[in-house]
């Protein structure tokens, strides 16, 4: 039986519409609290404690209060971190030996969306069976704990400062960032009071943008999903590099001094090359079905095995664990370095890239010399919820035609989003015009069949 509420990255939707409503989120907090309280890891006679962090959406206040009430009703204590990047919640949950962490965020989505995602005590995303147990509790009546058994809530002192120090600890002690001018784009999101301090305290001349959240402007024309603002700022300020995070700061895009943008695929290659230089060998790395073919070829040329996971950082993580490897990434900017953090972290990933540049004495362009990405065209087609795109003969025919034309010189990938009713059509080809033409033909077939 499939999960009803949990997608690839927690529970997400439009605020005010199921399931992102205050009554549902209260019941979700209660259900999660009951599952935690019944865990074998909670000592008899003690009560679990969870950490709640959020991004800067106006709805975060409402959902935070609802979650807090639900946990308290289940007899679970709550610590409130306030605005905090998703990887910051994962780190603090592990560092403070808490029972779980919860993030209120819809990541790169606009302000009118929000979501809830959970981390286990070790800072990893919840396993499927735990999410299933929470969903099962949602069907049960809410039975409030007795007055002397209610959970308590308190603010976590200096949550931001604790996480800042963790981020800095992942940068080599022998290095500093003095002499570097960096533009840091925080997407008006959760890292707005954190990321600029990390890079400044390591010595960089920091020019922050996207650091004036008002509850409504998260990811709006700024951040990792809208890098044009960063490109302009890097050029205008004659900066050495630009670093763009998304709303919850688990994604990274980098811009060099010329305005060239580097995505997660390219940054993965840079980190693997750096690891080879320092450790002598990297057995393998993980990308996704969307990873550019040129990166796979380049890694294999370096003697590095490459595995493609399903799209979603949780699936990249699964493959890394299965193979015992450290480095993986998505083109969207989720980068995993498991010897540094248990989850994707935009700030930590940026520091790893900067350390690689320091060690090599090269620019990003120089480190990627010889890696020419195949042109890709990605079209997101919004569908009616529940539309049967897999059963459409017209969509299948369009895909077959494109694959036949690109045989041996490109790829076609069609997949449904795990967080919204969108079908992602991606075509990769040696010639950009071919990628665009085939992607648009398939997208037209999808629109005709599903809207």
UniProtKB/Swiss-Prot annotation:
The keyword Glycosyltransferase does not apply. The active site is at residue 107. Binds 1 Mg(2+) ion per subunit. One of its GO terms (biological process) is UDP-N-acetylglucosamine biosynthetic process. InterPro entries: A-D-PHexomutase_a/b/a-I, A-D-PHexomutase_a/b/a-I/II/III, A-D-PHexomutase_a/b/a-II, A-D-PHexomutase_a/b/a-III, A-D-PHexomutase_C, A-D-PHexomutase_C_sf, A-D-PHexomutase_CS, Alpha-D-phosphohexomutase_SF. GO terms for molecular function: magnesium ion binding; phosphoglucosamine mutase activity; phosphomannomutase activity. Coiled coil: none annotated. Activated by phosphorylation. It comes from the Bacteria. One of its GO terms (cellular component) is cytosol. Its cofactor is Mg(2+). Catalyzes the conversion of glucosamine-6-phosphate to glucosamine-1-phosphate. This is Phosphoglucosamine mutase.
């Amino acid at each position: 039986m499939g999960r009803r509420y949990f997608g690839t990255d927690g529970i997400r939707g439009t605020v005010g519409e199921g399931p992102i409503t205050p009554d549902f989120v209260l019941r979700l907090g209660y259900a999660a609290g009951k599952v935690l309280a019944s865990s074998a890891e909670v000592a008899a006679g003690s009560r679990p404690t969870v950490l709640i962090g959020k991004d800067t959406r106006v709805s975060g206040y409402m959902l935070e209060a609802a979650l807090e009430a639900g946990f308290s009703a289940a007899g679970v204590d709550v610590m409130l971190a306030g605005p905090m990047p998703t990887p910051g919640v994962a780190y603090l949950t592990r560092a403070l030996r808490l029972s779980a962490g919860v993030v209120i965020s819809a990541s790169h989505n606009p302000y009118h969306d929000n979501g809830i995602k959970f981390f286990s005590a070790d800072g990893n995303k919840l396993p499927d069976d735990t999410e299933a147990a929470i969903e099962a509790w949602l069907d049960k009546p809410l039975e409030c704990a007795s007055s002397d058994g209610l959970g308590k809530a308190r603010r976590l002192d200096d949550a931001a400062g604790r996480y800042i120090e963790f981020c800095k600890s992942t940068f080599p002690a022998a290095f500093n960032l003095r002499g570097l001018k960096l533009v840091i784009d925080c997407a008006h999101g959760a890292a707005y009071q954190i990321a600029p301090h990390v890079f400044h305290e390591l010595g960089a001349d920091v020019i922050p943008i996207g650091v004036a959240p008002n509850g409504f402007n998260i990811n709006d024309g700024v951040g990792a999903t809208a890098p044009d603002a960063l490109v302009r700022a890097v050029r205008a300020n004659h900066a050495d590099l630009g670093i763009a995070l998304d709303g919850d700061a688990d994604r990274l895009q980098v811009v060099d001094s010329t305005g060239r943008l580097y995505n997660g695929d390219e940054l993965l290659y840079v980190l693997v090359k750096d690891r080879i230089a320092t450790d002598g060998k990297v057995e393998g790395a993980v990308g996704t079905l969307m990873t550019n073919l040129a990166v796979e070829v380049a890694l294999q040329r370096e003697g590095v095995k490459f595995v493609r996971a399903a799209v979603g950082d949780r699936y990249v993580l699964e493959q890394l664990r299965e193979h015992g490897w450290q480095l993986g990434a998505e083109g969207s900017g989720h980068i995993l370095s498991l010897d540094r953090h248990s989850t994707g972290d935009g700030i930590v990933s940026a520091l790893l890239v900067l350390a690689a540049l320091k060690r090599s004495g090269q620019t990003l362009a120089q480190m990627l010399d010889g890696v020419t990405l195949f042109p890709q065209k990605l079209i997101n087609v919004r569908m009616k919820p529940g539309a049967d795109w897999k059963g459409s003969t017209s969509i299948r025919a369009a895909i077959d035609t494109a694959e036949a034309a690109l045989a041996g010189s490109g790829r076609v990938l069609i997949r449904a989003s795990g967080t919204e009713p969108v079908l992602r059509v991606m075509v990769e080809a040696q010639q950009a015009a071919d990628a665009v033409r085939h992607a648009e033909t398939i997208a037209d077939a999808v629109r005709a069949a599903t809207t």
